[in-house]
Amino acid sequence: MYPAHLLVLLAVCVSLLGAASIPARPLNLYQFGNMIQCANHGRRPTWHYMDYGCYCGKGGSGTPVDELDRCCQIHDDCYGEAEKLPACNYMMSGPYYNTYSYECNEGELTCKDNNDECKAFICNCDRTAAICFARTPYNDANWNIDTKTRC
């Protein structure tokens, strides 16, 4: 084998090893973001909900700081229940990686009937949270808080 071929092979191997260490990005977060935009008619960017209070975003603990944060706590709990379903126990079928079918029609969200049990459950978790976000006031003071002292 030529030295150039070995270098190419080495580069490919290193790239694959690097890619294997990158955590998979949840697939349904994009759908959940679209549901939020549908329910609130695009009034607030989705990223505003990613670091709000004690529960909106990754993880969650303590007492929710307000009603919007409570929406996120309920959503987290709903995903926890989804993970317990036998239909959601397969690799890449849980709430963070499973995509579902839904419709948005003038702010009305509908989970479609063609979803299997796991997808239907996850879709309803996201739908309920998106509707909760849309009807609940947003307090700028609760965005990007110090969760170690406030939660």
Swiss-Prot record:
Cofactor mode of binding and number, as noted: Binds 1 Ca(2+) ion.
Instruction: Show the catalytic activity.
Output: a 1,2-diacyl-sn-glycero-3-phosphocholine + H2O = a 1-acyl-sn-glycero-3-phosphocholine + a fatty acid + H(+)
Q: Which keywords belong to this entry?
A: Calcium, Disulfide bond, Hydrolase, Lipid degradation, Lipid metabolism, Metal-binding, Secreted, Signal, Toxin
The active site of this protein is located at: H75, D126
Q: Which GO terms describe its molecular function?
A: calcium ion binding; calcium-dependent phospholipase A2 activity; phospholipid binding; signaling receptor binding; toxin activity
Record: residues binding Ca(2+): Y55, G57, G59, D76
User: This protein is called what?
Assistant: Acidic phospholipase A2 6
